[in-house]
Amino acid sequence: MAHRMGTNRSALINQILADYTSVVTPERRIENIFHEIEQLVAPARDLVPFFAPHTTSMSLKSSLEYKYRPTVKYEVALYGDKQEGLGELAVIFRTQSAQLLQSMTQFFRLWKRIEDAHLSGVEPDYALYDGKFVRTLSLPPDHDYTSEEIARAISDYVQLFDRLMKAYLAGKYTPPEIEALYCAQQQQRAAILI
């Protein structure tokens, strides 16, 4: 039975006990968040979500408006332990175009500068590797967020990042305009990722 459900016996027993006692396990909460993200991004069709049950990560794929339509994969990994933070977002891209690679790197650096200037509280950690931009995800500690609120915050953030990155790469917005759009979106959001 555990094998059919894509898990092991120990995890299955834990889940059965949690269901029986009406306790939401960290694993179930992560799965609920991913289901909610899937529902939130599906109508826009800019991001294609994918996640497998009983995993702590999901991916969202997006196509760039560029010569050969390269894809960007957003990988959201959530931690079960709140003390480690919420999780991390990795933006993974593969391209042979030196120009596109340079433009994406410039955007990632711009994004970090914007967040450094406008986020208060816990500062996220960033890393930029060949073909990968990583950012930690946290929520302000002043509130116990529901799965729906967390999913909304993550989906809003990824959609904003994707929309502004595509616009930047297409030359539609200058860095000051990207910053203004970022700030306007931050003011509208109920839960702000930090």
Q: Predicted segments — roles?
A:
Residues 1-2, 17:
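Short amphipathic alpha-helix starts
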Residues 3, 7, 25, 188-194:
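Terminal, compositionally biased segments
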Residues 7-30:
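Short, basic amphipathic alpha-helical segments that act as recognition/interaction helices
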Residues 15-17, 40-42, 119-120:
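Short, surface-exposed, polar/charged, turn-prone segments marking secondary-structure boundaries
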Residues 22-55:
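Short, positively charged interaction helices/loops
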Residues 48-101:
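Amphipathic, interaction-prone secondary-structure segments
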Residues 94-194:
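Charged, low-complexity intrinsically disordered regulatory/assembly segments
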